[in-house]
């Protein structure tokens, strides 16, 4: 399997491609990483150095890949945080090129905008760009509950309303939706859930909620779910494997006391997920 991953990169730490590439490689995926920024570290530190890559330069890299005549062998395109409107246009164009070479290729979009605690933290033009131009060409999206609400103009705060919001998102274009953080009032205290929906049904999985903030965990989640889903075609299987790997990665990081994900040290959790959490069908 080959995945073209168009995301940010950092020298220190693990976000964007610096979070997604190694777990994908560890489960046997050939990754073609294209960088949209090249920073010293992620912006959560409050200070960083390094360049934003101009959209035209990102496009040039993709054109160079196209000239190697490999776009027809790409199984999926993966994108995450989009720092500018121009990058969004480049990604949409890249998806069109890949699908022209292989109509069966999947575009997986992590529509990064913010979260319930922090609100929207991207440039003002990005949410509308994602909703109106990027998500409609995606086959798979991986929003959190907050992002799902923005995309669909809804308030998903129960299982029923979250499922309804997912169906509204699917009506926009993507057939498969992974909601990476579902919080509802009737869930047991100290837990959090993930929900996956495709044309065959809806599945939810519940895990303990770990007391931590982990930059890059959403990037790992989107990458692993995309690979497992493209490989198996089964949302239930992809959900079960992904949540196991990501939970164990986060638990290992929490135990270490380190701020950055223990991405390399946790590699066995990607290659051989324990699948310790039960997945339930809810639709």
Swiss-Prot record:
Reaction(s) this enzyme catalyzes, per UniProt: pyridoxal + ATP = pyridoxal 5'-phosphate + ADP + H(+)
Gene3D superfamilies, A to Z: 3.40.1190.20
A GO term from the CC aspect = cytosol
User: Does this entry carry the keyword Transport?
Assistant: no
Q: Which residues bind ATP?
A: 110, 147
Domain of life of the native organism? Bacteria
Q: GO terms for biological process?
A: pyridoxal 5'-phosphate salvage
Instruction: Give a GO molecular function annotation for the protein.
Output: magnesium ion binding
Q: Which UniProt keywords apply?
A: ATP-binding, Kinase, Magnesium, Nucleotide-binding, Transferase
The coenzyme or cofactor needed here is: Mg(2+)
So what EC number does this one have? 2.7.1.35
Residues recorded as binding substrate, renumbered to this chain, are: 8, 219
The annotated pathway is: Cofactor metabolism; pyridoxal 5'-phosphate salvage; pyridoxal 5'-phosphate from pyridoxal: step 1/1
Please give the HAMAP family that the UniProt record associates with this protein.
PdxY (MF_01639)
The free-text function statement in the UniProt record for this protein reads: Pyridoxal kinase involved in the salvage pathway of pyridoxal 5'-phosphate (PLP). Catalyzes the phosphorylation of pyridoxal to PLP.
Q: Which family does it belong to?
A: Belongs to the pyridoxine kinase family. PdxY subfamily.
Q: How does it assemble?
A: Homodimer.
- Protein name, per record: Pyridoxal kinase PdxY
From the broadest rank down, the organism's phylogenetic lineage runs:
Bacteria, Bacillati, Actinomycetota, Actinomycetes, Micrococcales
Record gene name: pdxY
């Amino acid at each position: 399997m080959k995945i073209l991953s168009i995301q940010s990169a950092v020298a220190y730490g693990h976000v964007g491609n610096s979070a997604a590439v190694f777990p994908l490689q560890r489960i046997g995926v050939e990754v073609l990483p294209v960088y949209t920024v090249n920073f010293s570290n992620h912006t959560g530190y409050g200070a960083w150095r390094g360049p934003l890559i101009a959209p035209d330069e990102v496009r040039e890299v993709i054109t160079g890949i196209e000239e190697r005549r490999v776009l027809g062998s790409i199984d999926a395109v993966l994108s995450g945080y989009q720092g500018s409107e121009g990058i969004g246009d480049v990604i949409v164009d890249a998806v069109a090129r890949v699908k022209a070479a292989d109509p069966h290729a999947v575009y997986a979009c992590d529509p990064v905008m913010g979260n319930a605690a922090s609100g929207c933290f991207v440039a003002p033009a990005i949410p509308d760009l994602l909703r109106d131009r990027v998500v409609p060409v995606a086959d798979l999206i991986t929003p959190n509950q907050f992002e799902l609400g923005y995309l669909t103009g809804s308030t998903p705060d129960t299982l029923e309303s979250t499922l309804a919001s997912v169906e509204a998102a699917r009506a926009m274009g993507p057939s498969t939706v992974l909601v990476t953080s579902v919080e509802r009032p009737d869930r047991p205290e100290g837990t959090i859930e993930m929900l996956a929906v495709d044309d065959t049904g809806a599945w939810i999985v519940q895990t303990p909620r770990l007391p931590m903030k982990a930059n890059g965990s959403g990037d790992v989640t989107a990458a692993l779910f995309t690979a497992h889903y493209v490989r198996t075609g089964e949302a239930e299987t992809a959900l079960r494997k992904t949540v196991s790997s990501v939970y164990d990665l986060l638990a290992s990081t929490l135990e270490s006391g380190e701020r950055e994900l223990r991405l390399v040290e946790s590699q066995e959790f990607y290659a051989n997920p324990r699948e310790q959490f039960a997945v339930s069908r809810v639709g």
